[in-house]
Amino acid sequence: MMEKNTMLFSLKDVGKEYQGPAEKIIIFSRLNLDIAQGDSVAVVGASGSGKSTLLHLLGTLDNPSRGTVLFRGRDITAMTAEQKAAMRSRDVGFVFQFHHLLPEFNTQENVAMQAVIAGMPRREAMKKAAHALELVGMSGRAGHRVGTLSGGERQRAAIARAILMHPAVLLADEPTGNLDERTGDSVGQLLMDLNRELGMTLVVVTHNNSLASLMNRRLELRAGELYDQNC
């Protein structure tokens, strides 16, 4: 169990813009945000408002145009590419709308694969994968090929892969977007269970109001500004 209520992320005057064909496209200009260890945060807003961009900044998949992003007090915008990769491997789990599981491998092998590629002995990675699958209620499907799994089971397997190394934060981009309502509700509840049981910080980009309502914080990105709807 991770210690809660310590600051995990602090964004200070963060701006992000891209150069368009004729002019700069401003995604957001000055975001300030604190996320504590153990928080569960929904990020909502219209398409194109910058929700996924914010998630990418937290996960070191992109850099801000200005400002600082602190992780446990350390400025991750100043990290080298190697340091960012190490942070992602150790501290960050990602879940996306599409699971990107490989059909030629079974469920447990898919969950273990990233750790094996990173250098973990296969036996150790498979043991960790078995435990992760147990946490998401998928022990009985460990030896099954991915093609035999339902949509909800595949997303659960993707979540198991994301939590394999017990990261400090799970970043999920539309994790229920490709699922029917009932299955999406089940996956949403699983994410909240992991947040509570493991103390894992959860940041979810979603258009699903049912999923957003489960979180203890709801942030809206609108016209380049961030609004905390719990304030």
UniProtKB/Swiss-Prot annotation:
- Membrane topology per record: Peripheral membrane protein
One GO MF annotation is:
transmembrane transporter activity
Tell me which InterPro entries the record gives: AAA+_ATPase, ABC_transporter-like_ATP-bd, ABC_transporter-like_CS, ABC_transpr_LolD-like, MacB-like_ATP-bd, P-loop_NTPase
Q: Describe the location of the ABC transporter domain by residue ranges.
A: 9-230
SMART domains (UniProt xref): AAA (SM00382)
Top-level EC class as recorded in UniProt: translocase
Report the subcellular localization: Cell inner membrane
Could you confirm whether the keyword Glycosyltransferase appears in this record?
Answer: no
An example GO CC term for this entry is: plasma membrane
Q: What is its EC number?
A: 7.6.2.-
Q: This protein's superkingdom?
A: Bacteria
Binding, ATP: 45-52
What are the UniProt keywords, alphabetically?
ATP-binding, Cell inner membrane, Cell membrane, Membrane, Nucleotide-binding, Translocase, Transport
Describe its function.
Answer: Part of the ABC transporter complex LolCDE involved in the translocation of mature outer membrane-directed lipoproteins, from the inner membrane to the periplasmic chaperone, LolA. Responsible for the formation of the LolA-lipoprotein complex in an ATP-dependent manner.
Tell me how this protein assembles: The complex is composed of two ATP-binding proteins (LolD) and two transmembrane proteins (LolC and LolE).
Regarding protein family, the annotation reads: Belongs to the ABC transporter superfamily. Lipoprotein translocase (TC 3.A.1.125) family.
Q: What is this protein called?
A: Lipoprotein-releasing system ATP-binding protein LolD
